[in-house]
Design a protein with these regions (language model features):
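N-terminal "assembly arms/tails" that initiate or stabilize quaternary assembly
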Residues: 1-71
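Short, ordered beta-strand-loop transition motifs
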Residues: 36-39, 199-204, 230-238
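Structural beta-strand/beta-sheet cores of well-ordered domains, especially the beta-sheet scaffolds
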Residues: 41-43, 83, 154-156, 192-194, ...
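Short helix/loop capping segments that flank catalytic or ligand/cofactor-binding pockets
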Residues: 53-56, 167-170, 251-253
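Short glycine/proline-enriched loop/turn "hinge" motifs that connect secondary-structure elements
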Residues: 70-79
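Alpha-helical scaffold segments that mediate packing/assembly in large oligomeric complexes
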Residues: 82, 86-153, 260-265
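Extended oligomerization regions of viral-like shell subunits
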Residues: 140, 144-224, 236
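Extended, compositionally biased alpha-helical segments that mediate assembly or anchoring
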Residues: 230-265
Length: 265
């Protein structure tokens, strides 16, 4: 195994940042821990969506269309995410950081993997609002597409890449407010009722705003950790294996609660 190790001798241990994004998307979706079954099993889910209905009108004109809500049954497959870490006794004895860093990255890698699938579902949002600039009006107009009757108690959030966040700060200035109640990793500020979070792997020129109802993570609770007993062959060469696995599926279950704000210029 090609681990890069060192003789632990008067060296400080620096661990590289290996998270694709520190933003835990499980806190931004509905988590359903009732998932049962095994990898490859099918699950049918009703996915709700709505058509756009906002129009710019002149005096005396009225809307020619209205927002329509519908649902479609979609079939999802239960996923199994698994990784393994292998090392030899001699490697662990030579470098005391090998096993802690390796096992920690098992969790990091699993986190990145599940996060990517959740974000992929947010990116399926069918409602969109094009804008020439990420200004106050853009966030208010995009929020209106969700057609929420009562905003009380509803938390709307937005995922923004770092480059676009700089543009937003310049465009919004005093309209970007910092609300202590929403402070968590990545939180930058709130505009027009939308809490903005920096996500370093978000797409440039595209901001996704949503509520927790948009995406559901169906989760078989807990991550399984297995360290199988060594076979005779592995024992002979002093080889160890640790395995972690997780069963889950992420689904855009309510497309009426997610909107893409896309930059046109």
């Amino acid at each position: 195994m090609a681990h890069v190790i060192y003789d632990n001798f008067y060296l400080s241990n620096e661990v590289e940042d290996q998270f694709n994004s520190h933003l835990n998307l499980q806190t931004f979706c509905t988590v359903d821990n009732s998932l049962v079954g095994t990898a490859g099993m099918k699950r049918r889910i009703n996915v709700y969506q709505a058509t756009n209905g906002t129009e710019k009108l002149a005096m005396g004109e009225g809307n020619t269309k209205s927002i329509e809500v519908s649902y479609a049954e979609k079939e999802y497959e239960v996923l199994l995410a698994q990784n393994k870490f292998e090392y030899f006794d001699e490697q662990a004895m030579t470098d005391s950081m090998l096993v802690p860093v390796g096992t920690r990255h098992m969790g990091t890698d699993m986190f990145n993997h599940v996060n990517a699938d959740i974000f992929a579902e947010f990116k399926k949002a069918s409602l969109s609002h094009p804008t020439a600039v990420f200004d106050f009006a853009a966030f208010v107009d995009a929020q209106a597409l969700m057609n929420l009757e009562n905003l009380e108690g509803v938390s709307i959030f937005g995922f923004v890449c770092p480059a676009d966040m700089a543009k937003i700060r310049k465009a919004l200035k005093d309209d970007l407010k910092y609300v202590e109640a929403f402070a968590k990793a990545g939180y930058v500020g709130t505009v027009g009722g939308v809490n903005l979070y920096t996500k370093k792997d978000a797409t440039a020129g595209e901001i996704i705003i949503a509520t927790r109802d948009a995406v559901t993570l169906f989760n078989k609770k807990g991550t399984e950790i297995e360290q199988p007993p060594r076979s005779a062959d592995d024992a002979n060469i002093r080889k160890n294996t640790i395995i972690s696995r997780k069963y889950y599926l992420a689904a855009l279950t309510d497309a009426t609660k997610a909107v893409k704000i896309t930059l046109t210029a």
